[in-house]
Amino acid sequence: MGTKTKKTLFNVDEQMKAIAAQFETLQILNEKGEVVNEAAMPELSDDQLKELMRRMVYTRVLDQRSISLNRQGRLGFYAPTAGQEASQLASHFALEAEDFILPGYRDVPQLVWHGLPLYQAFLFSRGHFMGNQMPENVNALAPQIIIGAQIIQTAGVALGMKLRGKKSVAITYTGDGGASQGDFYEGMNFAGAFKAPAIFVVQNNRYAISTPVEKQSAAKTVAQKAVAAGIYGIQVDGMDPLAVYAATAFARERAVNGEGPTLIETLTFRYGPHTMAGDDPTRYRTKDIENEWEQKDPIVRFRAFLENKGLWSQEVEEKVIEEAKEDIKQAIAKADQAPKQKVTDLMEIMYEKMPYNLAEQYEIYKEKESK
């Protein structure tokens, strides 16, 4: 026998709308580079503004050159970053050196600006073990390949920071596809329960490889998923570097003051394929959509903003481009000199003390490699 309920008791539509309405998109610069939210303007000096722009231009060149090197067979796995410079670099710009980064595979630029030598970034793309070894002064893990797994790791690292009394944060990056993984919810829930100083950045570039965000989740925003974990959520224009910086700086301040983690959803777009491993974006998105997002380009709008303030010029930008090209040239040359990878290398870097069940295999490989 079925049951009947009084639907007037359950305001389903109103509840859903009310939740989504809490997460208005933060924007400071519009597509023309004009300030539309003076109250939210972050306190950045002229030199800081120019440095952020320099990093964005440099990283665009790095992306273009990396794609070219991949096509030449000189790089292996590569996930293009063009279009996401504001989401990646403006968020990183709000961090301190002692903060810990747990990136996804598209987030190599943040590692480079956090201190990872460029030649090691290229070695990571080539699958060389040296590319996964962070220098001791770089607080980061190598990029996570398993989608969403870094969320749980971030919760643990952040809790460790809290227990040690450190005034620093653990920040992680994933995409909208990562926000559909179980690890995403588990990590946020854990961090929220312990008020761990974590920042979860979801770069919503509209597609999990080829699956549009609308088919991944019924939620109107990714930011509202913070509600279930009892943490703070923000949605920002991910093509606006000032909005991304302001949101991240706010999240960091909350975290180090013991107020717990924050989920930041950046609305952004990747211009290229998901990776250079055969993905064809024309199969799942239209040229009109691509053109629409290219009109929002983060470098173009930030350039307009800085030029209006007299802080940037084509001459300055050309110097940055040439600097990037020269650095990349030298880094590739150094990466080419890396020793050939051996099986024993992988065993040695994995274990401080070789497990007994691998010791015999290790000796066998070592003998073979010595010949």
UniProtKB/Swiss-Prot annotation:
Signal peptide: none annotated. It is an enzyme of class 1 (oxidoreductase). Keywords: Oxidoreductase, Pyruvate, Stress response, Thiamine pyrophosphate. GO terms for molecular function: pyruvate dehydrogenase (acetyl-transferring) activity. Induction: By acid stress. Under acid-stress, this protein is expressed at a higher level in wild-type B.cereus than in the acid-sensitive mutant strain NB1. Its cofactor is thiamine diphosphate. InterPro entries: Alpha-ketoacid_DH_E1_comp, DH_E1, PdhA/BkdA, THDP-binding. Its EC number is 1.2.4.1. GO terms for biological process: branched-chain amino acid catabolic process. It catalyses: N(6)-[(R)-lipoyl]-L-lysyl-[protein] + pyruvate + H(+) = N(6)-[(R)-S(8)-acetyldihydrolipoyl]-L-lysyl-[protein] + CO2. The pyruvate dehydrogenase complex catalyzes the overall conversion of pyruvate to acetyl-CoA and CO(2). It contains multiple copies of three enzymatic components: pyruvate dehydrogenase (E1), dihydrolipoamide acetyltransferase (E2) and lipoamide dehydrogenase (E3). Heterodimer of an alpha and a beta chain. PANTHER family: 2-OXOISOVALERATE DEHYDROGENASE SUBUNIT ALPHA, MITOCHONDRIAL. This is Pyruvate dehydrogenase E1 component subunit alpha. It comes from Bacillus cereus.
